[in-house]
Amino acid sequence: MYAVIKTGGKQYRVAAGEKIKVEQIPADVGSEITIDQVFMVGEGESVKIGTPVVSGATVTATVVSHGRHDKIKIFKMRRRKHYQKHQGHRQNYTELRIEAISA
């Protein structure tokens, strides 16, 4: 069984037992969260598509850890003007383990 969920402004295709990294969620490590924005649930040949969400469908996940992604480098330059700008960014994330999908 799999589902398409929305969290942190992004959509993820998840299945039970998977680990995913999502935008940071304010929850303690080891706590269980419930995601109710489920857009699609599928099992074998049967697929339920919501308008926009599947009513009564939830995904239960456990917070595994919090962390930060690798640093990305931003470099801006204007040629012949001696203008260069360096910047870096590290995005925070929360790692979730999908426990169950109920539809």
Swiss-Prot record:
Signal peptide extent: none
GO MF annotations in UniProt: rRNA binding; structural constituent of ribosome
GO CC entries: cytoplasm; ribonucleoprotein complex; ribosome
Domain of life: Bacteria
SUPFAM superfamilies documented for this protein: L21p-like
Presence of the UniProt keyword Transcription in the record: no
Keyword field: Ribonucleoprotein, Ribosomal protein, RNA-binding, rRNA-binding
Binding partners and assembly: Part of the 50S ribosomal subunit. Contacts protein L20.
Family: Belongs to the bacterial ribosomal protein bL21 family.
Function of the protein: This protein binds to 23S rRNA in the presence of protein L20.
Name of the protein in question: Large ribosomal subunit protein bL21
Species: Aromatoleum aromaticum (strain DSM 19018 / LMG 30748 / EbN1) (Azoarcus sp. (strain EbN1))
Species lineage: Bacteria, Pseudomonadati, Pseudomonadota, Betaproteobacteria, Rhodocyclales
UniProt gene name: rplU
